[in-house]
Amino acid sequence: MSRKLPNDLRSTTVLEAYRAHVTERAQENIPAKPLSASQVAELIELLKNPPAGESEFLLDLLSTRVPPGVDEAAYVKAGFLSAVAKGETPCSLISPEAAVELLGNMHGGYNIETLVGLLDDAQLAAAAAQQLKHTLLMFEAFHDVEALAKQGNSHAAAVMQSWADGEWFTDRDPVPEATKMVVFKVTGETNTDDLS
């Protein structure tokens, strides 16, 4: 039977363990592993009741150490941020607007349903549209945005126009005139697994 640690001690232990992991990996000149689904769940509990002096670190972990897309950790992150954006879960460190921005940084996957749904939200529609304008991994949700635009939703129409104009590309820094590279030549047959 495992003994549950008090919240202060548990949070310190979780953060200390992650910092130790970062230090260990840095000594090998490799980045820290992204957070797992269970680590993200623990992080969310800390975000709801942040230990003193850890707010910035917690926000950095949520924004930069959770893989985007459709892995289990991204699912947990998207669920939490969706609840914050919709006002279902209060979080003193993340406003609904900030939650929308963090959802947009996930680039597709579990964040899409919430962002598309927020196109109908009077307070957050503009923020959701801004994030969707730079999200390309929409899959079937493209049709949902299109349907909203056809129903007269101006935010959805703005997203569709942005995609048509390629703003996701034209808003980026220009492509450099020249790029220096190193070529790794392998004789015989190889695949990306060999390079991983």
Regions found by a protein language model. Give the residues of each.
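Residue-level signature of the C-terminal ends
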Residues: 50, 61-69, 102-109, 134-139, ...
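Amphipathic alpha-helical packing elements
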Residues: 7-44, 49
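Charged, low-complexity interaction regions
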Residues: 30-34, 51-53, 70, 88-92
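Fe-S-dependent hydro-lyases/dehydratases of central metabolism
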Residues: 130-196
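Amphipathic alpha-helical scaffolding segments comprising HEAT/armadillo-like alpha-solenoid repeats
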Residues: 37-45, 68-87, 106-120, 137-149
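Conserved hydrophobic register position within alpha-solenoid helical repeats
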Residues: 54-58, 95-102, 128-132, 156-160
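HEAT-repeat alpha-solenoid elements in large eukaryotic scaffold proteins
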Residues: 58-62, 89
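Alpha-helix N-cap/helix-start positions at coil->helix boundaries
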Residues: 52, 89-94, 109, 121-126
